Amino acid sequence: MLKDKRTQKNSQRRRSTTNKTSSEPDEISNLKDSQKWTVNADSTMLFRYSAITFNGHKIHYDLPFSQKSEGHEGLLTHGPMQATLIANRAFASGLPIKSMKYRGLSPLVCQHPFDVEVGKDQDLIIGRVISSKNKITMQAEFTI
């Protein structure tokens, strides 16, 4: 019974997240000092990130497993890796960051370049990862 309620709750959460998220990114160009960085993650980068974070999930480094067993288009880029890339750009601003919140929105396949965008909005730094299909996969907010 408890498992059924948890499964139901997770399904509702996924549906509400999907409804809130648009495949088209909001404009970031209106943010002060916005920066865009293109990253081309490859299987070696994902394997190394898996190793240093002790993440043994095969969707990050075993292409046949990711495609055949899990049904993904390719290897998936780690959520925390995306958050780390956003944080790297945010800290490069030189502004004193007090806190960070991030949220994964959708899977990011590693075989295509993706963009990391960061910009300032009042007392926040807003960051996100945008896939080659123009879909936001990760968003972050930094309090300054």
Place the predicted regions along the sequence by residue.
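Hot-dog-fold acyl-thioester-processing enzymes
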Residues: 29-93
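Tryptophan-centered motif/residue detector
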Residues: 1-3, 54, 65, 81, ...
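HotDog/MaoC-like acyl-thioester-processing domains
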Residues: 1-41, 108-110, 117-144
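Residue-level detector of solvent-exposed, low-hydrophobicity positions
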Residues: 4-9, 54-56, 61, 68, ...
